[in-house]
Amino acid sequence: CRALPGKGPMLHNHDTNETFVAMTGTWRASWQNEKGKLEHVDLRPLDLVSFPPGASRRFMNVTRGPKNRYSILMFVIGGNAPSAEFTAESMHRLERAGVWPPRRGRR
């Protein structure tokens, strides 16, 4: 993944494990704990974190410095055909933004 500071996907989960390795910059890996509260750890170059199947997670570039400088995060999702699912909160955000459900003719 290559992203600018402040960017990253919404909270989601996979049916397999997912491992993140910060290659450049600082990345915040967040997850929802058993009580539904968000926890996080900040990753610096070559730091690694892995999430088990079903754990809701997200990551964001939190690098300080120029807002137009990309940082790189490597991620590995296990399995031959893993699926992904956004959390209910993320789906509501997509609906409010008008991008879900997809409208005919829009890509």
Report the location of each language-model feature.
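Conserved short histidine dyad/triad with adjacent acidic residue
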Residues: 1-14, 53
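Residue-level detector of conserved, well-ordered beta-strand and adjacent loop positions
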Residues: 4, 23, 44, 60
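Glycine- and acidic-residue-biased ligand/ion/polar-headgroup-sensing regions
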Residues: 5, 15-28, 32-34
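Short acidic-glycine-tyrosine-enriched beta hairpin
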Residues: 19-21, 33-53
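Double-stranded beta-helix
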Residues: 56-107
